[in-house]
Amino acid sequence: MREPVSSPFTSFLAQHFDQINDYLATFFDGQATSADIERYLYTPLSAFTANAGKRHRPLICMLAATAVGGSFESARSAAAAIEHFQSGALIHDDIADNGQIRRGKPCMHLTEGTGLAINCGDLALTMVTKTVLDDPTLESDVKLRVLHELTEMIVRTIEGQALDLGWVRDGRFDISVDDYLDMATHKTAYYSGATPLAAGAIIGGGSDEQIEALRAFGLHTGLAFQIQDDLLNLIGTKEAANKDFRTDITEGKRTLVAVHALSDERYHDEIEAILSSGTEDPAQLARAVEIFQETGSIDYAHTYALDLTAKAKAAIEDVSLDPHARELFLSMADFFVERLN
């Protein structure tokens, strides 16, 4: 596979990447009251946060503010809060999944120990509300509305994580496509799309119509983002996945691909056996992917993600938005299902 060509959205992310990184660093620099607190808490959390992905979540929050007539900078505390949430959630998620690699590096619980990693994740989650509360540029009523969005996001994400982990723990293979969509919407779509956009639009002074349209756009694109993540874990490359390749099979994840394939009686028992085995054998992992291809499940998931992209674009079609921001949102929807890492 080849890398997709540069798009307006990827150019936007690259343009503002250093800006949001520099702002995020301010939440860790000089915060510790002793060298040991720095060593055991702020340094590892700062390093984890700095080892960034593309920063699309905070940057689309800031973009949403401009889309409804506000300023880009006005939403940066909410943007940072969402990135703090992701740091905490990912640190804890890696512990729950016994993960090995995150963003090309060993997971924090492997380098710092489980106890300190949990504590770092706890601090990151606490910083979600603190970051917004401490922003002197936001009016109190706006802070309350944004905090409502953020707390709802946290609850929904934790609910989705409960389903994801619970199905594996209980050996559940009776999961339907609708079950998967509910889980992935909760676990990923709120914090990867809906909440960043809604919070940014609130800060930017958007109307109820604008806020809800951007929320709907974010739910659709956020779900498409998760489905593409599932696909990349299976059929991407080990290098593009930062060595975290086909781990969804090893961990027995009920992805959309797996759930669809399980509905094929010809392969149900074999898929169930592989997903239940915890195997890291490359031959077994390749066999699972072969089955997913034979059942048409990979194509099914890709088509579903494309359909979500179309629904997302329709959600903002008739809503008044800044033209440049609209162009970036449409490009974002395409990027979420075209990216290769």
Question: Which residue stretches match the model-derived regions?
Answer:
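Mg2+-dependent prenyl diphosphate-binding active-site environment of isoprenoid biosynthetic enzymes
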Residues: 35-269, 334
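Short, charged, amphipathic alpha-helical segments
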Residues: 7, 144, 215, 303, ...
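Charged, amphipathic alpha-helical oligomerization/scaffolding segments
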Residues: 15, 19, 23-26, 149, ...
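Hydrophobic, well-ordered secondary-structure elements that form the walls
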Residues: 258, 312, 329
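Mobile late-domain/C-terminal helix-loop "cap" segments
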Residues: 269-319
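N-terminal amphipathic/basic leader segments beginning at the initiator methionine
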Residues: 1-32
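Short, amphipathic C-terminal "tail helix"
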Residues: 308, 321-341
